[in-house]
Amino acid sequence: MAGRLSESVGSGPGAEAETAADPDAKRDVLEHLCARTHLKQLVMEFDTACPPDEGCNSGAEVNFIESAKETLEEVGKVKSAFESKALVIKRIQLMDALRKRVKENDGCARLIVETMRDIIKLNWEIIQAHQQARVIRENLNDIRRKRYFLKQAEGEKALRIFTTVRKKKEVVRMKIAEKLKFIHRNVQYERKVTTLVQNILQNIIVGCQINWAKDPSLRAIILQLEKDISIQNLL
């Protein structure tokens, strides 16, 4: 299809105009290239004949070299501009040839129209594909942002839970410690009171001069009073 399209375009009057314009374009490009090559050669000859470290640079030579370099840059700019304009002209000639060829309404013209329709359809599909890809990328970026925020919120929530549990454990530990201290103080107090009562009872029995050894009940009481009051003995 591409070969038939090129043949149909090349056989039109626009192609003849393009072919006629080609020699002038080639001649101008060759002239610019020759001028550029000549200027390069002149600059190299001046640099070789009079190196900067030998101190032989006169004002005229330096000016000529600078002028040659500027001219060389201008030639490059002109060449680029010429190539751009030539490309634009070729596009215009091609469009004009296509228009004229389509007006003939023959088999080649219909082929050109169908090809152009296919190209337009493909371009439209490419644009739609780019739009869909952009939407997918935006959705993917949104998902990544939401995932990042969820991870951040999850980390903050886990930290809050850990801090709350640690504080609760600390409060429970402090309460247990306070309760144990309270129980210990009560036990010490009860132990002192019990020891005092033991001493009082022992003194009473001894002061009454009772033969407690003959009485089993008194002997058991005396032996019990002589024991050290502790939690293990109480148990």
Curated annotation (Swiss-Prot):
Annotated keywords: Centromere, Chromosome, Coiled coil, Kinetochore, Nucleus
MF-aspect GO terms: kinetochore binding
GO biological process, one term: kinetochore assembly
Residues in coiled coil: 125-145
Origin superkingdom: Eukaryota
Keyword Membrane: no
Primary residence: nucleus
TM segment ranges: none
A Pfam family reported for this protein in Swiss-Prot or TrEMBL: CENP-H
CC terms in the record's Gene Ontology section: inner kinetochore; kinetochore; nucleolus; nucleoplasm; nucleus
Disordered: annotated span: 1-23
Keyword field contains Coiled coil: yes
InterPro entries reported for this sequence: CENP-H, CENP-H_C
Compartment(s): Nucleus; Chromosome, Centromere, Kinetochore
Assigned protein family: Belongs to the CENP-H/MCM16 family.
Role played: Component of the CENPA-HI complex, a centromeric complex involved in assembly of kinetochore proteins, mitotic progression and chromosome segregation. Required for the localization of CENPC but not CENPA to the centromere. It however may be involved in incorporation of newly synthesized CENPA into centromeres via its interaction with the CENPA-NAC complex.
Assembly information from the UniProt record: Component of the CENPA-HI complex, at least composed of CENPH, CENPI, CENPK, CENPL, CENPM, CENPO and CENPP. Interacts with NDC80.
Protein name listed in UniProt: Centromere protein H
Native source species: Gallus gallus
Top-level taxonomy: Eukaryota, Metazoa, Chordata, Craniata, Vertebrata
